[in-house]
Design a protein with these regions (language model features):
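Flavin-dependent oxidoreductase catalytic cores
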Residues: 19-425
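N-terminal amphipathic/basic-hydrophobic helices that include classical n-h-c signal peptides
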Residues: 1-24
Length: 425
């Protein structure tokens, strides 16, 4: 009798949970409805997330890069994000990457014009790669909170001085001004993946004993300072562009930043008032990139993208660097809901958003926007097809989560299954 009563209570609780979920979904905004992002109004709530592009061999905008972003814009996204626009030459991830300088503005203007012609907005992801930067190909010493070895670049990053930190903040402000001049609608400040700001946030990497190390409040000074430097620059220009940030919820590394510390950081960023939205991400480009990507770990293919001896080292240690995490739809939602419950500002859900069901779920959970990457790499027109399908839920992504696209990030990023975006023209 007792067991029957408990079973009945369990069924009632499950039914109540389903009813609440259905009620939320019924009252949630339509992902295809227009939405405000700071001063912008996007035509829908779907953003193409920033990804490696490898389409700038001379560190300047090419027709290839323009087409790479024009395709998802024509394919229906509300906004596409150009990555990675470093704030300085030494802040690039590798030597062919674009950095924000006057010579880059005309090319960026051609890009933003092309995106606007398709009815979409366009954001520039700006940041300093810090210890992730390839000092050899950049021909500039990388920076980190402390002297730190980059296993990919096979070089040490030097400890950033106070003058270095001031310079990086000034570079972010200048990058924002150049983005405005180039016609961008938004800038996204990279605070994740153990790039410079994220490295300062990480207790594993940041072992400083000065005002930028030790307590979380000290470790967060660089991230908060960068955001406010950009905000002041944007406000001074009187520009109506949005300012967002990409923030790690967790590094996925023992000793790295966790959700509790990251949530506290997010609250500070919210209270500072410099951001119009935060895109929630995870993982470390230095130690554990698959914590962000999930799915198959393409060790053989990724190793093949490097020259010996790094190729051999990657093959021998690849299982440790490219750890395999099972894929599931909306795989960052569990952690993201912790942030949604505590923050009032707009949040962007990333990770495993591949179909209408996951988009609707994100809206029901209170997220203002969703961000997609691999699914749009595989099918740049996916959003238009989902929109045409309506609420039938009959359109699913061609992305298989094989992650072999990761092996192409240094040689024109593309989907090796569909051939897109090259074969989507």
């Amino acid at each position: 009798m007792m067991a029957t009563r408990f079973a009945r209570q369990g069924h009632q609780a499950a039914a109540l949970a389903i009813a609440i979920k259905l009620s939320r979904m019924a009252t949630a905004p339509d992902v295809f409805s227009p939405a405000k992002l700071g001063p912008l109004t996007l035509r829908n709530r779907i953003i193409k997330a920033a990804t490696f592009e490898a389409r700038t061999p001379d560190a300047l905008v090419t027709d290839d890069l323009i087409e790479y972003h024009r395709l998802p814009a024509a394919g229906g996204v509300g906004m596409t994000t150009v990555a990675y626009c470093a704030v300085s030459q030494g802040g690039r991830t590798e030597g062919n990457g674009i950095w924000m300088r006057p010579e880059a503005v005309p090319g960026f203007r051609r890009l933003t014009d092309a995106i606007h012609a398709e009815g979409a907005a366009v954001s520039a992801q700006i940041g300093h790669a810090g210890p992730v930067a390839n000092a050899k190909t950049n021909k500039a010493t990388a920076l980190a909170p402390v002297r730190f070895f980059n296993p990919i670049g096979m070089r040490f990053a030097r400890k950033a001085t106070r003058e270095d930190i001031d310079d990086v903040m000034a570079d972010h402000a200048n990058a924002a001004r150049l983005a405005i001049e180039a016609g961008f609608d938004a800038v996204e400040i990279h605070l994740g993946h153990n790039y410079l700001a994220s490295a300062f946030l990480s207790p594993l990497i940041n072992r400083r004993d000065d005002e930028f190390g030790g307590s979380l409040e000290n470790r967060a000074k660089v991230a908060r300072g960068l955001v406010m430097a950009v905000r002041r620059a944007v406000d001074k220009e009187g520009a109506r562009i949005a300012v967002t940030a990409k923030l790690n919820m967790a590094d996925g590394v023992r000793g790295g930043i966790n959700t509790e510390e990251s949530l506290t950081t997010a609250k500070w960023l919210q209270d500072d008032g410099g951001l119009d939205a935060i895109e929630l991400t995870a993982g470390s480009s230095l130690v554990n990139p698959m914590y962000l990507f999930r799915g198959d770990a393409p060790i053989k293919e990724f190793a093949g993208a490097f020259k010996p001896p790094l190729r051999w080292g990657m093959r021998m240690t690849g299982k440790k660097f490219l750890r395999e995490y099972p894929y599931r739809d909306a795989y960052l939602l569990r952690d993201a809901k912790l942030f949604r419950a505590e923050l009032t500002m707009p949040l962007i859900l990333l990770g495993g958003i591949t179909n209408r069901e996951t988009m609707d779920l994100a809206m029901a959970e209170g997220f203002h926007f969703v961000a997609m990457a691999r699914a749009l790499l595989a099918e740049p027109d996916l959003i238009n097809r989902i929109a045409a399908d309506g609420a039938q839920h009959g359109v699913h992504s061609a992305c298989t989560h094989c992650n072999r696209c990761l092996a192409t990030i240094y040689s024109r990023t593309r989907c090796v299954v569909t051939g897109a975006p090259d074969e989507a023209r």
